[in-house]
């Protein structure tokens, strides 16, 4: 079938029932696939490309599009120099048209420069403040996001069909952010992240986290 179709990997065999009374052929194997193969996007003008996108679709590769309405959270992982910042810049450029953004940039690097160019506020370290103060500032912002979630839940209780604008919390180097920080502040930080990840889906509040690794220890 390759390259006309791309088979989607499954964890185990996928059986389907067939419309027949013959017990020998009442079942069949189902192979999910999509037409074509995914190829890298080549974008000559990012601003023009993002403005031409329809609805809440985010192209990841050719023949591979993600609907942001169906996304809970996004994680970008990779070693240094693997292109995490490049990918993040692309996603930010797409998301700015469909979502409100809260950007946290511990390295005061690429996301901060992008935010400045697009006139979006960014939380970054300051010379006269400790790392614990910096994470405390982030916790305040996350608490406000959690308040928004609870407020939106109340609106949904009265009107289940109410549509909210997406709100995306972007945190670069999320694991390195908590190293060397007061334990109470660190625990509060991860607790807020967990609550937002758990409750944010129905209220269209998302996390976009970037780190060198994500595993069961993190």
Which residue stretches match the model-derived regions?
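P-loop NTPase catalytic phosphate-binding loop
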Residues: 27-154, 167-168, 175-218
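Interdomain "pre-motor" coupling segment immediately N-terminal to P-loop NTPase/helicase cores
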Residues: 1-41
């Amino acid at each position: 079938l390759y390259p006309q179709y791309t088979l989607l990997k499954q964890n185990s065999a996928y059986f389907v029932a067939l419309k027949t009374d013959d017990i020998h052929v009442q079942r069949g194997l189902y192979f999910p696939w999509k037409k074509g193969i995914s190829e890298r996007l080549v974008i000559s003008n990012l601003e023009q490309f993002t403005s031409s996108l329809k609805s809440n679709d985010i192209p990841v590769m050719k023949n591979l599009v993600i609907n942001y309405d169906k996304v809970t959270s996004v994680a970008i992982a990779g070693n240094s120099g693997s292109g995490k910042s490049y990918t993040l810049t692309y996603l930010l450029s797409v998301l700015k048209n469909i979502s409100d953004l809260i950007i946290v940039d511990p390295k005061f690097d690429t996301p901060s420069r992008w935010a400045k160019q697009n006139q979006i506020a960014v939380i970054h370290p300051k010379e006269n403040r400790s790392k614990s103060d910096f994470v405390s500032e982030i916790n305040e912002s996350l608490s406000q996001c959690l308040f928004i979630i609870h407020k939106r839940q109340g609106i949904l209780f009265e009107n289940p069909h109410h549509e909210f604008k997406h709100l995306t919390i972007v945190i670069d180097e999320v694991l390195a952010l908590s190293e060397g920080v007061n334990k109470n502040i660190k625990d509060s930080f991860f607790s807020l992240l967990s609550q937002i990840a758990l409750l944010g889906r129905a209220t269209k509040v998302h996390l976009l986290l970037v780190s060198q690794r994500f595993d069961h220890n993190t």
